[in-house]
């Protein structure tokens, strides 16, 4: 049994009493039709365009279709957990998974949306890995942030080059063993080596991101659904 609302209009009886009449395309009255539903089934009301479940109840009289496009359909009784993401597809109540939508009454996986989602995750991982600290000269930890580290190092190398100074103890590092801030004396060549490490790490992060992105369009829907950005980034990073 199924009832689809086509029109809602005000009905006035002979005694002047008015109420909203609910009718299908055949002009059948909802208040009469609801009596024809099986008493033991679950009645599901959903929107015919979005398939979003609006209400469920075993008692058809407790279902209240109020506008055109509301559909009431009965299915075998089952316990249903009320949720804002319940949809009625192929006579079943389902929950859409991430990056799924409904088109023409069928659940469809949104590949492009999932790919863009993965790209965003990869972009964040690129920054995380490119800016992670690295071991310098075997005894110091150095971060690789664009604003706080790479830009400052470029300025310092330029200053030392212009002034002709060969070394300085103005650069802050982290001691490998104590994790305390230290200011060792470093030469211009030390800073150039540090800059090389920074650029190499940044380039590796960019390359890792690009290689993974290039693979995405070749993956199946199932592979995209189960794609773990961090796991794939780490795997390629270690190679």
Model-derived segments and spans:
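A preference for well-ordered globular domain cores
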Residues: 1-41, 48-77, 90-239
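Extended alpha-helical coiled-coil "stalk/arm" regions
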Residues: 81-82, 87
């Amino acid at each position: 049994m199924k009832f689809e609302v086509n029109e809602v209009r005000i009905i006035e009886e002979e005694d002047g009493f008015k109420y909203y009449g609910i009718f299908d395309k055949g002009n059948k009255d909802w208040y009469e039709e609801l009596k024809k539903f099986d008493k033991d089934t679950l009645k599901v009301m959903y929107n015919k365009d979005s398939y979003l479940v609006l209400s469920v109840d075993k008692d058809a009289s407790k279902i209240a279709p109020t506008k055109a496009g509301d559909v009431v359909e009965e299915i075998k009784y089952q316990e249903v957990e009320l949720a804002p993401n319940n949809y009625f597809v192929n006579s079943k109540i389902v929950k859409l998974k991430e990056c799924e939508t409904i088109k023409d009454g069928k659940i469809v996986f949104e590949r492009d949306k999932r790919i863009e989602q993965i790209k965003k995750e990869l972009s964040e991982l690129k920054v995380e890995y490119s800016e992670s600290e690295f071991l310098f000269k075997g005894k110091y930890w150095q971060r690789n942030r664009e604003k706080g580290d790479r830009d400052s190092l470029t300025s310092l190398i330029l200053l030392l080059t212009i002034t002709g100074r060969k070394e300085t103890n103005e650069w802050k590092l982290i001691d490998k063993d104590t994790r305390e801030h230290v200011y060792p004396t470093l030469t211009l060549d030390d800073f150039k080596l540090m800059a090389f490490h920074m650029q190499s790490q940044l380039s590796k992060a960019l390359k890792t991101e690009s290689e993974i992105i290039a693979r995405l369009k070749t993956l199946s829907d199932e592979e995209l659904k189960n794609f773990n950005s961090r796991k794939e980034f780490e795997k390629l990073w270690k190679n």
